[in-house]
Amino acid sequence: MSKSKCSVGPMSSVVAPAKEPNAVGPREVELILVKEQNGVQLTNSTLINPPQTPVEVQERETWSKKIDFLLSVIGFAVDLANVWRFPYLCYKNGGGAFLVPYLLFMVIAGMPLFYMELALGQFNREGAAGVWKICPVLKGVGFTVILISFYVGFFYNVIIAWALHYFFSSFTMDLPWIHCNNTWNSPNCSDAHSSNSSDGLGLNDTFGTTPAAEYFERGVLHLHQSRGIDDLGPPRWQLTACLVLVIVLLYFSLWKGVKTSGKVVWITATMPYVVLTALLLRGVTLPGAMDGIRAYLSVDFYRLCEASVWIDAATQVCFSLGVGFGVLIAFSSYNKFTNNCYRDAIITTSINSLTSFSSGFVVFSFLGYMAQKHNVPIRDVATDGPGLIFIIYPEAIATLPLSSAWAAVFFLMLLTLGIDSAMGGMESVITGLVDEFQLLHRHRELFTLGIVLATFLLSLFCVTNGGIYVFTLLDHFAAGTSILFGVLIEAIGVAWFYGVQQFSDDIKQMTGQRPNLYWRLCWKLVSPCFLLYVVVVSIVTFRPPHYGAYIFPDWANALGWIIATSSMAMVPIYATYKFCSLPGSFREKLAYAITPEKDRQLVDRGEVRQFTLRHWLLV
């Protein structure tokens, strides 16, 4: 193809480097011509041995600015768990000593997997399902991560609705969680502001009857009106209204694709850092704050001898970066073809880790303050999960001057932390399916509306009187072992079936530089072994979910496992379908199933790279 034939108007053209020869078979050269006009890239690839059908030029929008992409990735990866989980894990597992396994696993597994997903999406320019043209038999992995992201939307949006409810409740002279004279309070409520003394109980016990705890469980959730998951009751209208607002925000952030979402993240991805800085400056001035920070940073290297510390570090790395949800693939698929995805991976993973670590100073300055206020040890107030941000933090903020303003700012931060992460999850579903089915592509806005409405309807179960039980069940099963399984198969598919050498050649075409031996070894050996370890540990250490003293019935646990296995089942189901639908003998079916679609002509000639030992040994 000559360059002059492809020139249309005042477009800019970039010709990527030609591919290196394949390990087996004749030399194959691919010319990738990238053009850009009005923010839309046109890509066209041809082979020296052209396919039988004419080459089509595919049009795909790109991010308006590079910073839109970076903020979207950072906004997705930095979510509520950075605030409520990492600081607690660090404190629980030896303080500063926990950083040793955390940073080790981040460097040898987290960053390589993050880099892999960015490169995979950017080169193939499709969503989580479409990228598996590199190994058609494993396309089910794409549907696995899409389904998981869909499941997560059922309960994650509810957390944002809680934050929105608290945000609106903050616009009062007296915050509703500081007194026991409200209609939802029980006789056991103990107004902390009516007494300067402490009963000496730990806050894990005391919080069961504090105004903040009762406001969350009785005033917001109305949990006292439910006996369990089999007694949900109707949706609460206040939470339903907040959920509607969340869904509306999500729809209008996503309906035009990255052109709209790329602008929204300028607010949602940056505001949390402004608020965290303000909270840190306020927190360190509180009495007891230094005690909390010392507890957070105290180093106990003997804890590194405990397997649980390494397990916590491994799982935190897996979940904190957001690999395996298809979001990174979807976001990077809208990048320019020549974008430096290696640099993006280093920048965003570093920011994610630094945010997790620095948020610990904010959290523990307030926990130290609460411990001194109640005259109890730090360990009695240190916790993770929703209890930290919806019970402990609100009570701490309520004791400050201008408490209503601080509360509004804090819950606005939670709202923005949640919104851009929820946007990422929905974008994974939308992009993954729109790229796969042309009918949906032609009606993207209508399909986006359908996805957010489906998410809303199923989220209604989580805003009933017993909705916290549904929330806990989904949180436990929807994206636990299943997401780890999906990432494991993804890593094996890219590094082993497609091949590290071929994948590295793809990256060289985009960035002009081939990944060095370190990254190739991580993709080929370290990351798959790490993921296998985490999957096995997650199965061996599995414990049924519970909420406080409530134990879920057997049928609920069975339902949870159905949810978990339904997403994982996409891998064998699609593999079986693909294998059976291919023509030829068993060997020919297998060859077509594991060979990239662009190399089908090699299979026709009997030259299957994956059938050679060299392919599996190359690094």
From Swiss-Prot:
Mediates sodium- and chloride-dependent transport of dopamine. Also mediates sodium- and chloride-dependent transport of norepinephrine (also known as noradrenaline). Regulator of light-dependent retinal hyaloid vessel regression, downstream of OPN5 signaling. GO terms for biological process: adenohypophysis development; cognition; dopamine biosynthetic process; dopamine catabolic process; dopamine transport; dopamine uptake; hyaloid vascular plexus regression; lactation. This is Sodium-dependent dopamine transporter. One of its GO terms (cellular component) is axon. Disulfide bonds join C180-C189. Monomer. Homooligomer; disulfide-linked. Interacts with PRKCABP and TGFB1I1. Interacts (via N-terminus) with SYNGR3 (via N-terminus). Interacts with SLC18A2. Interacts with TOR1A (ATP-bound); TOR1A regulates SLC6A3 subcellular location. Interacts with alpha-synuclein/SNCA. Interacts with SEPTIN4. It comes from Mus musculus (Mouse). Changing F105C: Reduced sensitivity to cocaine. It is a multi-pass membrane protein. Residues 172-235, 287-305, 376-399, 542-552 are extracellular. Keywords: Cell membrane, Cell projection, Disulfide bond, Glycoprotein, Membrane, Metal-binding, Neurotransmitter transport, Sodium, Symport, Transmembrane, Transmembrane helix, Transport. Glycans are attached at N181, N188, N196, N204. Dopamine binds at D79, S149, G153, F319, S421, A422.
